């Protein structure tokens, strides 16, 4: 195999390698992964003879086989529908409640002294 044959083989390997890598890279969903639940998928790496993990891009739709749907964010499927089970936030704090509004107390009216009747006024003299 001469220099031309070796070059041709290397070009073919580079082309097919880049085509395979194009189907398996972070942020893109290969056609073969349309029905993949969650936000990650695996592609075979012939060089390392192992599976490489990749993630769908932020904003990609995701789902679980239970029927729950969501959106990928940082490699995790954040659900937009609920199964009625615990949520994925891990925060068990109840939602804040509003403090009941207090009624304003009306100021007490000062009582005016009773006017003495004429009879009472005469008795004091």
UniProtKB/Swiss-Prot annotation:
The species this protein was found in: Ixodes scapularis (Black-legged tick)
Protein name, per record: Ixonnexin
A Gene Ontology term for the protein's cellular component: extracellular region
InterPro entries: Ixonnexin-like
Comp. bias (Basic residues): 101-119
Secretion signal, residue range per the UniProt entry: 1-21
Record flagged with keyword Signal: yes
Tissues of expression: Saliva (at protein level).
CDD domains tied to this protein: TSLPI_Salp14_NTD
Glycan-linked positions: 26
Role, per record: Salivary protein that promotes host fibrinolysis via accelerating host plasmin generation from plasminogen (PLG) initiated by tPA/tissue-type plasminogen activator (PLAT). Does not affect urokinase (PLAU)-mediated fibrinolysis in the host. Enhances amidolytic activity of host coagulation factor Xa (F10).
UniProt xrefs under Pfam families: TSGP1 (PF07771)
Annotated keywords: Fibrinolytic toxin, Glycoprotein, Hemostasis impairing toxin, Secreted, Signal, Toxin
Assembly and oligomerization: Homodimer. Interacts with host PLG. Interacts with host PLAT.
Residue span of region Disordered: 81-125
